[in-house]
Amino acid sequence: SLGFKIMPLYIKDMSRDKIIAASTDGMMMSGRSPFIMQGWADMEKQEIEDIEKVLKSKGIKSELEVDIGLVPEIVTDRMKSCDILLIGKNEAITERIVSILKGNYKSIIFIGEKPLKRMEKVIIANDDGVKINRSCYQFTNLFPEVKEFTSFVINKEIEENHLIGYLEGKEKTITHEVLNTTDYNEVLKKIDEYDFFIMGNLSRSYFFEKIIGKNGIKLLEKSKTPIFIG
């Protein structure tokens, strides 16, 4: 109903094959690896069957493609033919997701607890930086039908917000506010009232930002609302 043509893709991750036990003298102990590999093969088969059932139940007629290789490399190659990468999101940024974020050159939508059903209420994390500006540029080109946005910044007055002016120049209606709070549960609660959340891409030092508790990591990991990063 949102007008997407979906290309479902399942990747059998070759990096799993690198997991193998080693003895104390450095000799490789591969005796148990066939059992491990068979267990993974059975799990992958079941996952593929489960995904195919879900696709069918959702009315998605596109055939699930199965590829084998390193996940970031395959994603990078497949995105040459696509506009947006759609990824399921847990409450943690894994190393695999970080690799995809670093290498991806197209827009990304993260889907967490809350499904993407409509785009009537869209909210922007607006610090007037270049990354959120780029995300909004990509979003408005991909979804020109969205005309109204809510914009917020946390504990920061911006005298001249260029992003607001940019969006208004594209005939968009913007409602902007400053959230004066140090409680990120309040911010998340507000975001989760919306259908879609636009944020800028994070810096390349994802895990360092996670350790020191940077705002973007918190919002990316904890938000239930679907997230768009351009």
Regions found by a protein language model. Name each.
Residues 49-58, 94-95, 158-167:
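Short, charged N-terminal beta->alpha structural module
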Residues 77-146, 222-230:
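Intrinsically disordered or low-complexity boundary/linker segments at protein termini
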